[in-house]
Amino acid sequence: MNLIEELNLNKEDVVSTKKLSIKGEKKVFDVYRIPLEYLKYNKKNGRIATYISQFIDEGHDFSKDINEFNNIIEKFIEESNPDALRKTKQNIKILSQTEPAVVLSNGIIIDGNRRFTSLRQLSREGAGAEFNYLEAVILDSEKYNDKDIKRLELNLQHGVESRVDYNPIDRLVDIYRDLIENGGVFTPEEYRGETQKTLKEVKKDMEISQLLIDYLDFINRPKKFYIARKQQVDGPLREIYTILKSDKIDQEYKTDIKEYLFTNIMALSGDTTRRIRELKTVFEDRRLSKELLEEVEQDEILDDITDYFNELDVKCDTVELSSELIEKIKSTTEEFVERKKYKNARNQPIELLNKAFKTLNEIDTEALA
């Protein structure tokens, strides 16, 4: 299908224009009003990556009927951020569509999924004929390859509008697929150029994305990203990244440290991110770190957890440790965090005295004479 030909569009149908950067060039494109029934969601949309993977893992197939297909994806768009959709829908209802979307000539939406969703819902609700159309740029699907389209998506996501509503796990999945999986679609340098990030930030995101993959492998749920979304592991993974990047930890035991930290994601309750952060000073104290890992090995905690995950039904969406394992991990973590706090408190008077002596030694006694 070619929308331009199918709808017999010409210059008289142009309602506005939109500037886009594609294939390294900035161009001004015409914007048309397209009937909603000719349009289709993009199931490769990074915003709903975890929902798509869950849908497929559960054994479902996408319908070839465009309306049924769109109904499935619409539900994912709404679930991913209902508040943002509600705001977009309300704005469109009051002001109409103010920002043009971007679609391919085959009808697949590249940018504007939430606007499309809002219009579909308003149209179904009988809000008015004006909501039966999406205003969008139409790009020739034969002219641009997947990399060109992905580059455009990144440019739109990180350009004028700050996309703060992007689920952090879906973002990590997107980074993994764009930069790591099968060699990546982009080099880190190319990605930096499209996202307005520094190369250091891009490489950090890559390492955290890889930690997400490692974590899911550790719990024997490889690439089941929706589990990570449900567990809200973004904060804990970022703390783990900080710990593993510390030059104070013993690099010889880096893998054991990482796996023990992964177990804490599963075992700790409350503010997991903060509680994992507290382990940083423990692992930076090499003596305490060694003692903790020796205790973990002696109690066979990591071995027991590996066996536990291997015995769980891989198809099970809920991943929880047994109460016995949770208690083992919690008590070990709490013991060493408290020991480190006690050690710091005990050393504080000595540190204060050293600072005092240093200050006294720096006093110019001749100036006092």
Predicted regions and their residues:
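Short runs of predominantly hydrophobic/aromatic residues within well-ordered alpha helices
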Residues: 115, 172, 188, 233-237
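Helix-turn-helix/homeodomain-like alpha-helical modules used for DNA recognition
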Residues: 27, 56, 242-297
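Amphipathic alpha-helical "recognition" segments
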Residues: 127-134, 198-270
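Amphipathic, charge-rich alpha-helical segments that serve as recognition/docking helices
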Residues: 76-77, 124, 128-217
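Charged/polar low-complexity intrinsically disordered segments, enriched in acidic residues
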Residues: 287-369
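Short, charged/polar connector segments at secondary-structure boundaries
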Residues: 1-130
